[in-house]
Design a protein with these regions (language model features):
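Structural preference for solvent-exposed beta-strand-turn elements
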Residues: 1-150
Length: 150
């Protein structure tokens, strides 16, 4: 753009802007919202939930652990929390899909439970390092076995 094509513009105060805006949900916040609601006692409503493969996988894991989760719309969830000690052992492995955030946070949640759990993921997640989570948990007394040293 040449100087002759340049136009200067100075914003000026105008009338107040009134309205509503709805921003998309956030994946990281959605994982955490599901987990915190599941560990709370009573019913929680999550609005602004980002529905995607990763967040659906995290919700499915909590359902396998005995938490009732409803989806009245793609952007909301109703979670019937069971409290810190209300999770139930799953007879099957808990599949986190490709959700690294979900798996890492679940490792911490499950380390404090009175039952053993197996977390699995897809091929991509299975290659990612987990030591930055498993080592501190082991230092706090958790018994964690990982595949292929990771």
């Amino acid at each position: 753009m040449s100087d002759s094509d340049r136009k200067d513009w100075t914003p000026r105060a105008g009338a107040p802007l009134l309205g509503r805006i709805r921003v998309p949900g956030d994946k990281s916040v959605s994982h955490r919202a599901i987990m915190l609601a599941a560990l709370a006692e009573g019913v929680s409503r999550i609005d602004g939930f980002l529905e995607g493969e990763d967040t659906r996988a995290t919700a499915a894991v909590f359902q396998r652990l005995g938490v009732k989760i409803e989806a009245p719309s793609p952007q909301s969830r109703i979670v019937h929390g069971v409290g810190l000690r209300g999770l139930r052992a799953s007879a099957e492995a808990l599949d986190c899909g490709n959700a690294g955030t979900g798996m890492r946070l679940l490792a911490g949640v499950l380390a404090g439970q009175a039952f053993d759990s197996v977390l699995i993921g897809d091929a991509s997640l299975s290659k990612r390092p987990m030591r930055r989570v498993t080592e501190p948990l082991a230092l706090m007394g958790a018994r964690i076995d990982t595949a292929d040293g990771g």
